[in-house]
Amino acid sequence: MKSVIAVAAIAAVASAHEARSPLDLGLKVGNLVGVDLCLGLHVKLPAGISIKTDDCPTQGPPAGCIDVWHPPHHVPMDGCDDNDNDEWHYVHPCDCKPEAPHTWTTSTVTQTQVKTLISCAPTVTDCPAGPHVTTVVVPATTTICPVPVHSTTMATVPAGNTLPATVPATMPGTVPATMPGTVPGTMPGSGPGTVPAVVPGTAPGTLPATAPAVTQAPVWTKPANQSMPATQAPPPAITTPVVVAPSPATTPSKASSPAVVVLPPVGTGAPPTGNWTTPPVMAGAAQNSQKVGAVVAMGLIAALLI
């Protein structure tokens, strides 16, 4: 009978221990490390946390807790809602979630104490001469606490917004600079591969630039003592004077004026192209031509009469 009761008690203890297991409670604690240093108690610690003998539990987990030994925390950690406990404790499972993810960290704090010796007692034989500074280091204090986990977000830039690696350094060939009403001229110093100077308003989409002076055709000016005819007849193709003489069979009783063709002044030619002014016909040259024609006619008549 006693053996039956002992077996039943052992089974009850085992079942109670399994009921407090994190796997049976559906608790996701993460990586746990088993520790057997605490007076023969088998407890679990979160991964990365070490424990001293002074911090070990003295008994098993109470009702409603599991065998995961926790340092104090003030935010939900590993599914534990015992946030107000300032000592090591067993995990009290819950379905709560922290506002931000946290992880355990171990910090070590050391204190340094500085002492200054001004004088020594008479009994001190090896007293240093003058002030002496002695540094005393207090043993370090280790604290385990949760810290928030900062997630890193990578900022991506669309490929369509990327800029070209290099900018073309070459420019188009030269473009003749033109001005309204003038003959297109060649810019001084222009050549293949040079940047053209574009006159404002000559083509859309070009940048204005100052163009050098364009050489124009010479403009003929009218002399002050000559008149400008209304029209100018084109010069004939034949430049040799042609004299028309009367028939030798008939002898006129009275000298008649022969028909004389008036030629244009010598040296006149095709007008210049481009920006030019129509040159006038020289009145004096026409009169000289008429006089020459009259003298030639009179000479012919005199030869016939002789």
Curated annotation (Swiss-Prot):
Topology within the bilayer: Lipid-anchor; GPI-anchor
Phenotype when the gene is knocked out: Blocks the adhesion of conidia to onion or celery epidermis.
Chief localization: secreted
Listed Low complexity bias regions: 239-257
Induction and repression of expression: Expression is induced in bean root exudates and water.
Keywords: Cell membrane, Cell wall, Glycoprotein, GPI-anchor, Lipoprotein, Membrane, Repeat, Secreted, Signal
Residue ranges of Sequence repeats: 166-173, 174-181, 182-189
Residue ranges, annotated region (Disordered): 224-257
Task of the protein: Cell surface adhesion protein that plays a key role in virulence by allowing adherence to plant roots surface in order to colonize the roots.
Family: Belongs to the RBT5 family.
Stated name of the protein: Adhesion cell surface protein MAD2
